[in-house]
């Protein structure tokens, strides 16, 4: 019987399967950070339990980390969370990359860098964007703190079996279209609830043509489409990325495991509970205008008018979003001015993202009145970027070059957008207050964010490149 990759991984990890009840799944990798783990470790202590598989548990500090002076942690709660993680990892024998470690960074960036993320795995973390790791052909999803404790104690997790959803991107992408544009276009077209109760498999020629870092961007925002997780069947691109990484088998063992990984791909003729298709050729550089990731459009479009709404519920949603964003209905996206630019986050802070931004920025200057930040996703990315001279490109243009961390993606560290000001951000969420109280967030790709920094407003980066302005 033909099966999807989702079914293959789920079935191979099911420990308990009772009719009408959630399945008990074995967990291959449990990633931990400082924000969602303190109560979980305390629960272990109170119950007199240990961590069942410390060798399959990995920790880092990322959410609260300052990106200017990493050790100047002025918020007492943030400091306590970081100190508590270090103490817990020491007590329970868990590997942790702290602020001094050369591999420190955002958990969803360093996991793949270190080869911890591998095809066929079930991966969990107390963070919603764990779906990033699905790019490798893994079922990866975020969990709550009580579930973190359960996984620490048992290396298993109870989960209801999800439905399967295929999102097929047909044809080839036009030049200048990024993975971020693709996932934003998918969410804008199908809505933020298209994936509810499902795990998405992304398929199609456009997906196969993407690098692993681009695939990570796609899967990262599966959660913004309402899905439990998102993944892509592994192929030679996946295997080439993983070969030689620290935690990946070497020599004959590598050849053997690649043979197993290759068997994970969805079988020809396998069926999904639902399939939807988007034409790659219709996707243009995207900009969100509202307060959820589905409220977005191509740069050539305008913010919707209230009369464009298909229902009274949608009309109210548009009105509320535009009131918060302080944008008039019908405003062309290319007329929206910005005061801040943030290039970073677990969505778009890898080396290829920084290269894309640098290609636009090179030889140009940040517009007057715009504050622009570049925050690498890991210290490894920062080091590589500096070796290539990308940091000089950014600094000469007027960007602030920072250390790694979650930074301005969320207002849990010193990097915030002031109230009432507008940010072009490569992160994944544009909810009210996400980047700071009263902050207004527009989600875009690294290239589009770079172009906005130069122009002081949203522009079609393809036209900027074609005109020789960068």
Swiss-Prot record:
Cofactor: [4Fe-4S] cluster
EC number(s) from the headed UniProt entry: 4.2.1.33
Record key words, sorted: 4Fe-4S, Amino-acid biosynthesis, Branched-chain amino acid biosynthesis, Iron, Iron-sulfur, Leucine biosynthesis, Lyase, Metal-binding
Enzyme class: lyase
Pathway: Amino-acid biosynthesis; L-leucine biosynthesis; L-leucine from 3-methyl-2-oxobutanoate: step 2/4
InterPro entries registered for this protein in UniProt: 3-IsopropMal_deHydase_lsu, Acnase/IPM_dHydase_lsu_aba_1/3, Acoase/IPM_deHydtase_lsu_aba, Aconitase_4Fe-4S_BS, Aconitase_4Fe-4S_dom, IPM_dehydratase_rel_enz, IPMI_cat
GO process terms (BP): L-leucine biosynthetic process
Gene3D superfamilies registered for this protein in UniProt: Aconitase, domain 3
GO molecular function: 3-isopropylmalate dehydratase activity; 4 iron, 4 sulfur cluster binding; metal ion binding
Key word Lyase present: yes
Transmembrane segments: none
Keyword Membrane: no
Signal sequence bounds: none
Superkingdom to which the source organism belongs: Bacteria
Cofactor: how bound: Binds 1 [4Fe-4S] cluster per subunit.
Catalytic activity: (2R,3S)-3-isopropylmalate = (2S)-2-isopropylmalate
Family note: Belongs to the aconitase/IPM isomerase family. LeuC type 1 subfamily.
Assembly and oligomerization: Heterodimer of LeuC and LeuD.
Job description of the protein: Catalyzes the isomerization between 2-isopropylmalate and 3-isopropylmalate, via the formation of 2-isopropylmaleate.
The protein's name: 3-isopropylmalate dehydratase large subunit
Species the sequence originates in: Shouchella clausii (strain KSM-K16) (Alkalihalobacillus clausii)
Gene this chain is encoded by: leuC
């Amino acid at each position: 019987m033909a099966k999807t990759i989702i079914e293959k991984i789920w079935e191979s990890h099911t420990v308990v399967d009772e009719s009408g009840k959630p399945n008990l799944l074995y967990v291959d990798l449990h990633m931990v950070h400082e924000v969602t783990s303190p109560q979980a470790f305390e629960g272990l202590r109170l119950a007199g339990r240990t961590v069942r598989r410390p060798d399959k548990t990995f920790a880092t500090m990322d959410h609260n980390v300052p990106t200017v002076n990493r050790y100047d942690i002025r918020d007492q709660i943030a400091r306590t969370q970081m100190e508590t993680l270090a103490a817990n990892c020491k007590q329970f024998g868990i590997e942790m990359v702290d602020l001094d470690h050369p591999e420190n960074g955002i958990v969803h960036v360093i996991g793949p860098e270190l080869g911890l993320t591998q095809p066929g795995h079930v991966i969990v973390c107390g963070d919603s964007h764990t779906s990033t790791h699905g790019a490798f052909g893994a079922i990866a999803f975020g969990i709550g703190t009580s579930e973190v404790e359960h996984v620490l104690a048992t290396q298993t997790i109870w989960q209801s079996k999800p439905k399967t959803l295929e999102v097929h991107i047909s044809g080839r992408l036009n030049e200048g279209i990024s993975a971020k544009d693709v996932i934003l276009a998918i969410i804008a077209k199908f809505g933020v609830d298209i994936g509810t109760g499902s795990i998405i498999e992304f398929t199609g020629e456009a997906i196969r043509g993407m690098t692993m870092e681009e695939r990570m961007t796609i899967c990262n925002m599966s959660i913004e489409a309402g899905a439990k997780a998102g993944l892509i069947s592994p192929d030679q691109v996946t295997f080439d990325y993983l070969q030689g990484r620290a935690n990946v088998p070497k020599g004959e063992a590598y050849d053997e495991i690649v043979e197993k990984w290759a068997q994970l791909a969805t079988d020809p003729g396998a069926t999904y509970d639902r399939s939807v298709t988007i034409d790659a050729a219709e996707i243009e550089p995207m900009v969100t205008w509202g307060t959820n990731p589905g409220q977005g459009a191509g740069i050539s479009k305008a913010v919707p008018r209230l009369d464009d709404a298909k229902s009274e519920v949608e009309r109210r949603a548009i009105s509320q979003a535009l009131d918060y964003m302080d944008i008039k209905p019908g405003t062309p996206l290319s007329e929206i001015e910005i005061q801040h630019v943030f290039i970073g986050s677990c969505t778009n802070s890898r080396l290829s993202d920084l290269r894309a931004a640098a290609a636009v920025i090179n030889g140009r200057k940040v517009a007057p009145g715009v504050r622009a930040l570049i925050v690498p996703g890991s210290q490894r990315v920062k080091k590589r970027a500096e070796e290539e001279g990308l940091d000089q490109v950014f600094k000469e243009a007027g960007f602030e070059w920072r250390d790694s961390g979650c930074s301005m993606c969320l207002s849990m560290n010193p990097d915030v957008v002031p109230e009432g000001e507008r940010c072009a951000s490569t992160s994944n969420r544009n909810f009210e207050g996400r980047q700071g109280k009263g902050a207004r967030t527009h989600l875009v790709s690294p290239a589009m964010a770079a172009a906005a920094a130069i122009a002081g407003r949203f522009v079609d980066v393809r036209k900027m490149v074609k005109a020789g302005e960068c």
